[in-house]
Amino acid sequence: MPLLNSLATPYAEALLQVTEARSESQTVAEQCKQLLSVWDSSAEFRDAMVSPVLEPSSKKKALQGLLAEQVTPSLMNLLKVLADRQRLQAFEAVMNRFLELYREQQGITLAQVRSAKPLSEAQQAALSKKVQAMAGTSKVDIDLSVDPALIGGFVVSLGSQVIDASLAGQVRRLGLALAKAS
């Protein structure tokens, strides 16, 4: 992954500089999150964009047709540059690196929350308040994901701190306690 990060950083830094100059960093950060969601959920889109068979011009045309109305010109230009340079395989790394740099610049803490089932709006709001209290700031970006292996409950990762309130975690801790007792 370090090689991919070293490839992604210059693109992400350039995008951050351009979006800062145009006062659209927050908008582009939200668009990056949406694009990452599409990238993760659509294998067809992802496979087409990283395919060595498709010409860069075809990829650019597809990106323009699909995303022109959904993203800012700055972000569209970056996507076209990645297509031109055959770097769309680094798309996810570039978007994630941009989001890291944006959060760092804005003083936003990232909290990753994995839950056994999708959380309701009320649960998300309550969890958000708890995470903000844990982080000691109201500037918290919560990344929610569903992990059925947790069986029940959730796991919050906030920097190097991990709070495991999952059923799978409780079973694991119980097993360790029983192993020590015997």
UniProtKB/Swiss-Prot annotation:
Record flagged with keyword Membrane: yes
Signal sequence segment: none
Record flagged with keyword Protease: no
Location(s) in or outside the cell: Cellular thylakoid membrane
Domain of life: Bacteria
Principal location: membrane
Listed GO MF terms: proton-transporting ATP synthase activity, rotational mechanism
GO cellular component: plasma membrane-derived thylakoid membrane; proton-transporting ATP synthase complex
This protein's UniProt keywords: ATP synthesis, CF(1), Hydrogen ion transport, Ion transport, Membrane, Thylakoid, Transport
Membrane topology: Peripheral membrane protein
Family note: Belongs to the ATPase delta chain family.
Record note on quaternary structure: F-type ATPases have 2 components, F(1) - the catalytic core - and F(0) - the membrane proton channel. F(1) has five subunits: alpha(3), beta(3), gamma(1), delta(1), epsilon(1). CF(0) has four main subunits: a(1), b(1), b'(1) and c(10-14). The alpha and beta chains form an alternating ring which encloses part of the gamma chain. F(1) is attached to F(0) by a central stalk formed by the gamma and epsilon chains, while a peripheral stalk is formed by the delta, b and b' chains.
Function: F(1)F(0) ATP synthase produces ATP from ADP in the presence of a proton or sodium gradient. F-type ATPases consist of two structural domains, F(1) containing the extramembraneous catalytic core and F(0) containing the membrane proton channel, linked together by a central stalk and a peripheral stalk. During catalysis, ATP synthesis in the catalytic domain of F(1) is coupled via a rotary mechanism of the central stalk subunits to proton translocation. This protein is part of the stalk that links CF(0) to CF(1). It either transmits conformational changes from CF(0) to CF(1) or is implicated in proton conduction.
The name this protein goes by in its record: ATP synthase subunit delta
Gene: atpH
